[in-house]
Amino acid sequence: MIKPVSLLLLAAVLCGSCGSRTGRTAAISCDEPSARPSEYVSTLVGTHSDFTLSTGNTYPAVALPWGMNFWTPQTGEMGSGWAYTYGAHTIRGLKQTHQPSPWINDYGQFSIMPIRGRDKVDEESRQSWFSHQSEEARPYYYSVYLADHDIKAEMAPTERAAIMRFTFPESDESGVVIDAFDHGSYIRVMHDKRTVVGYTTRNSGGVPDNFKNWFIVRFDRKIRDFQIYDGTKPVEGEQLVGEHALVRVGFETRRGEQVTVRAASSFISQMQAVQNLEELGKDDFETVKAKAQAHWDEVLGRIEVEGGTTDQYRTFYSCLYRSTLFPRKFYEIDKNGNILHYSPYNGEVLPGYMYTDTGFWDTFRSLFPLLNLVYPSVNAEIQAGLANAYRESGFLPEWASPGHRGCMVGNNSASVVSDAILKGVTPEEDIATLYEAMLAGRRKVHPTVSSTGRLGHEYYNTLGYIPYDVGINENVARTLEYAYDDWCIAQVAKKLGKTNDAAMLEKASQNYKNLFDPETRLMRGRNADGTFQTPFSPYKWGDAFTEGNAWHYTWSVFHDVEGLIDLMGGHKGFTRMLDSVFVVPPVYDDSYYGFRIHEITEMQVADMGNYAHGNQPAQHMIYLYDYAGQPRKAQWWVREVMDRLYSAKPDGYCGDEDNGQTSAWYVFSALGFYLVCPGADEYAVGSPLFRKAVIHLENGNTIEIDAPENSSENRYVGKMAIDGKVSERPFLSYSTLLEGAKVRFEMESEK
């Protein structure tokens, strides 16, 4: 039986957590849901990754949902994008991180490491062996035994602060290292206040010249002694501005004695870091941990599921956890309760919201549609932040971390902004600014970050496509995404009564047809003189496409699937081509890159032909069967992907998780529907994974999804009824769901 969220939390308080509290995940012995959804989450999913093969490229983030600061155990070297890898044997520190992806890397990071020894200060000498058998990784709590130091380290988060508890051995050489990292940092020891303050300037780009992350670290006992270093060189005095400032503070401890550390940071100022530390109040470690878990239970409990296996619950809630981390809050709250932010675009401290660390090329597809449906109040703040980003930089971001970053293609901020406006999520006062921003982005490109705005807009707006032979790479991908983005803006123009804009944009949205090759029935690069590129291989990755090939990108016509069906000769021809994606061998041409990129390997090992679920351009593809009158094929493949390519293990993804996108695909698919075209009202139906699900909407309504005959064999939808009325089409509308709908699936096996 599904219980209301409030009863779930009450039951958790009265009864405690279900299952074992040791190891990586709770040991739940039955297939009925736990009282606490947070107990199902493993933050280690996707961490068994490296440069050559991604099974998520994640790290175990100890954080609150959308929190400004995350914390993670650090196994990688300082500056490595792979901060934590499951196959590593040693931990170098507990790092405050803002990293969205190893490919984007980190900024504003520093670390705290408990040690035993006076000289074990730099990361090589202080690192300690650990075992996953003595590690617990939860969203709200992390603990590990640091074997070389004989210390148990624990941490629990708030949005901008964290509390740590270190259990020491008997030693007169116990200590804690605070490492502000290299590339310019500052440390000051305030001995009488049991406090260390400082800043780090480390970043990977996308920041103004005055960027700093100010931090404060406070101990619950007097500091016996301390030593500041610049790198490995000891420095006299109580403070240092240097290339690489770090400090070891010392204590004498009895065996089992605990030292509690409170830490916070601010991108605004040292005083604001002190203010952010107040998030912890006077709470002790267990109270902070309990509050963090309760917060996660509320957020994850917005969606309740039952009638699945324990492994399916673990995978589902681990994916929902990943779907509620990014984009992160980049705003702070001053002592008077005012919301303000350090602008990563112009370096000023300004009022209002700001969010960051997301790439819209990935997340427009599933993550933002999930926010609009289940967490619209969060996306309302994000949209207000996007309006601020435009005011502060003249552009909407496409990849923000924390400011504009040069990564990926497209102008998919238009999708993210449009879908929120059309679904009534965007604050009314920001709509005009955001509409202006979308139109402006069609006609220009950022002067230093060419992935922001529209590279090639002059060709696209005159020829109707970006030519293959004008020196702009990934031209087909750009054209297809610009066409879809124009359709999105057109829908907003209609809503706002901008009829001339709407007509112009609707026409431009048909530009995808300019790159369709009727001979191969695939999208293909086209030269400025109108001829198609030669030679042409549908297996060639990159070049005209982005991290994919023609088999992947031909389907990137989210807004006009019927038009694409017509180009392919109707439903039969369309279905034949879609079938072919799963049938053609996973061969490839990597000559554009000069080596086999990890996305190619992930496609190959999935054993699904040329279907590449590990990368975003293909993730909507299966649901296109619904538009061609073949919903059972969609249902088959959706289940295959969920069953074969996702799990709650460290290798639980089939490619980069990408800031909630690949996880949100699973969340939607497990519920039984998916938004193929953000900006539209219609979800395509797949195959629900659970026998029952309830979505608690912020407007007070609930969506109830029932599939009582559901099983691994009964993966096909024989009949679907919405509020008791049988639907003849495999689609659900957003407006119907928002009103609170009862959706019943009659599941059956293949006949």
Feature map (PLM): residue ranges:
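Accessory carbohydrate-recognition regions in carbohydrate-active enzymes
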Residues: 25-368, 372-415, 421-480, 488-514, ...
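Bacterial lipoprotein signal-peptidase II cleavage site
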Residues: 19-25
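Sec-dependent N-terminal signal peptides
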Residues: 5-13
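C-terminal motif of bacterial Sec signal peptides marking the signal peptidase cleavage site
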Residues: 15-17
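ATP-dependent phospho-/nucleotidyl transfer catalytic cores
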Residues: 485
